[in-house]
């Protein structure tokens, strides 16, 4: 039997601006609101059917650190048995999360998964809080 991965819905948060109305909203809260809303809109899929959550995040530190995917599972009201992981591929993190969930479905490892992405461009400075580039690589053009 061949498994096909199917996207049943897609949603996102509003896009904020620097010092705009979204200032002070934590990225884990924002991502959890999106996942919770996704589950509420799709009542044919129950939270106990979700077998994995893969969260893309280019800078998983500060308020987006500490395995933010687990925080999103808890804050969105998913069962604590739902595993989660964070993928860092910089600008391609959320797309890689989607690829990983679809691959897990197509290989038969899971039947239902959520891929998501989160990035608070204003709470993490460019390069992160403590960039420590390897000296030899930093010298290369």
Protein language model annotation of sequence segments:
Residues 55-63:
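A glycine-/small-polar-enriched, mobile loop at the entrance of the PLP active site in fold-type I
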Residues 49-56, 114:
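Short glycine-rich phosphate-binding loop at a beta-alpha junction
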Residues 1-5, 17-47, 62-66, 73-141:
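Acyl-thioester C-C bond-transforming condensing/cleaving domain
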Residues 11-15:
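Short polar catalytic/cofactor-binding loops
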